[in-house]
Amino acid sequence: MGANSFGRFFTLTTFGESRSAGVGAVIDGCPAGIPLCADDIQKELNRRKPGSSGPFSTKRNEDDICEILSGVFEGRTLGSPIAVLVRNKETSSKDYENLKDVYRPGHADYSYDLKYGHRDYRGGGRSSGRETIGRLIGGAVAKKMLEAFAIKDGKKTIEVQVRAEEIAGIKTSLPLKEDEALPEPIFEKLSALASNGDSAGCILSCSVLNVSEGLGSPVFGKLDAVLSQALMSIGAVKGIEIGGGFYSASITGSENNDISKNFSGGILGGISCNMDYPLNLNHENGRKDENTCQIDFRIAVKPVPSIKMNQASFNKKGEKCMLSVGGNHDICLFPRIVPVVEAMCYLVLADAFLVSKIERF
């Protein structure tokens, strides 16, 4: 199966299936000498670990302990491929025996069978959310690399902020952090959905702070294009808008060009930049200081497709049937999806940073 790798110079390859012996990642292109230890990766894994994100997350029994197999020695990267493994505890197929010949609606069961003619039906196999563990591993390494270069260059470190602005169709009064308690209306809505064997989606607002200007490679390596690809590759993400997004289509050119706003989302012509002159003008010399920029975007996350409610579908013979998906599953992917979104941002920026070093003397 192709397309399991991401990046040009800083590359991530993920491996493993939902119920295989393990999942993990191989990162290549990370420079030597970057401080890195297992704890740097583990703290990110703990944020998406099953059962650790409140009453509406999956109760699947997994420890999600990372093992660094190569590429790191005495707390620093070697410049060689970094291989990291997370072993799966739950590898039994008992919850999926009744589904091996039936296609679950909203899943990749049918499309994988259609394309490959052979698939791992246990928990979705390669299309499972367990695949995102490899992304967290890569994102953790990318984050450490960007931090190291920021410290070396005397710059602020990049910070990715992901908040929920809508859950289960209910808007939050203020963007909700992953560790904040759910507002009562949302909690009650999710509780009702869980009781009915149903699930919910969410809309996330995201800001990436302290991004160096000049990242991105026109025309097919535009930063917003690569960022969109990275985020849309997350299985549950079904939409993205950068900056003003669809709102930009409803305003005038003069409004959209207003440099006191950030309708561009911090990216123009596919290159990260900050045209917010009034806020960044150096009044002593009358020029805009060389600065960082802020990338703003929103993403739509679909409802979890594994639900206990009876649904109509069909089997391999093309016969209609009704099915209910058992096992342990999330009711909503917030907040467990937050570190996954962050990881993809760090991967995109780490790669763009390395690419930028060879694009200009």
From Swiss-Prot:
It catalyses: 5-O-(1-carboxyvinyl)-3-phosphoshikimate = chorismate + phosphate. NADP(+) binds at residue 48. Disulfide bonds: none annotated. GO terms for molecular function: chorismate synthase activity; FMN binding. This reaction introduces a second double bond into the aromatic ring system. Homotetramer. This is Chorismate synthase. It comes from Treponema denticola (strain ATCC 35405 / DSM 14222 / CIP 103919 / JCM 8153 / KCTC 15104). The lineage of its organism: Bacteria, Pseudomonadati, Spirochaetota, Spirochaetia, Spirochaetales.
